[in-house]
Amino acid sequence: MAWITIIKHSEAKGLLRRQYDAAIKRAAKIWNIVSIMSQNPPVLKDSMKLYQTIMFGESPLSRSQREMVATVVSSANHCIYWIRSHANDLRVEVAKEIKDPVATDEFVRQIAQDWKNAGLKSADYALCEYAEKLTLTPAEMSEADIKHLLDLGFSQTAVHDAVQVISYFNYINRIADALDVDLEHDIVSWEQ
């Protein structure tokens, strides 16, 4: 149960009502992370716009890479809400490539629980390593970390976009945990 009051859709007015309606149009529901931000509609609006841009906008990073990074960051932060949410989104993206539901679930489980043993290609391994380091020890980041990604074939735009995804999920993980966002009941858990 959330630790602050959530303004319900039926009670929402103005900008909040428009944001809720947009969420329903996009996802056929209002996610709990959206409703937890109901106390400040302008922040909700800007946060959701940033999310849509970094996760669905043009990028040299694939959708599956962005979802993988989101899952790794959420796992490093032990943020159950976002681990479940983005492991589920990662499953959707990876299923397009792997085509075997059992192998897909196992891959997603590995990314969420122990990404270092998920059998990643060297570039994706380095991307996850970068995400975990920036999440857990941001003061230790150096130019060498970026050079390593560039040497593996990532463009500067890809590195920039990775930093955006990593930073956003550190921000939104903290909102979910600090305000006790309820888990979504309709997300199939990779833990089953």
Q: What role is predicted for each listed range?
A:
Residues 1-192:
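Hydrophobic alpha-helical segments
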